[in-house]
Amino acid sequence: MHSCNPYFYDVMRRMVNQHPKLDKFDNARLGMGWWTNRIKDFGFGSNLGGHVPGTRAGLVPDSTYYNNIYGRRHWTFRTIYSISIGEGELLTTPMHMANLAAIMANRGWYMEPHLERDIGGKGKP
C-alpha cells in the first residue's frame, strides 16, 4: 500500500521552512502565513455557496490561530503538518472540494459555483 501523504508533508515542510537564517518558530509563522494565503486563493475559508442554504466557510488556520492555542513561539512545522493532507484544524465543505476540482478542470480559472435546479428544461427530478 502506498500513500501520497509523505509527498504533501514534504511540500508543506519546504513551504514552512524556506528561511534558513530564521529559527524554527519564525519559519513556522512566516511559512504558515504564505500557506494560508495560497489556500485561500482556492476559496477555502470563505462561504462559496452564498446562494445555497446551509453552506459554511470552513476554517483555514493561520499564525494567529496557532498562537492563540499554543502561544507565540511554541509551535513549529511538527505541530501543523497534518493540515498539509487536509486533516487537523483545516475544515472544508463539499462545496470547497467541488470548487477545487472545478478550478483544476478549468485550468486554473475560478468560476463561481452554482447548483442547477434542472437540466435541459425538464424541471426538477
Question: What annotation goes with each model-predicted range?
Answer:
Residues 1-125:
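Beta-lactam-recognizing serine transpeptidase/beta-lactamase-like catalytic domain environment
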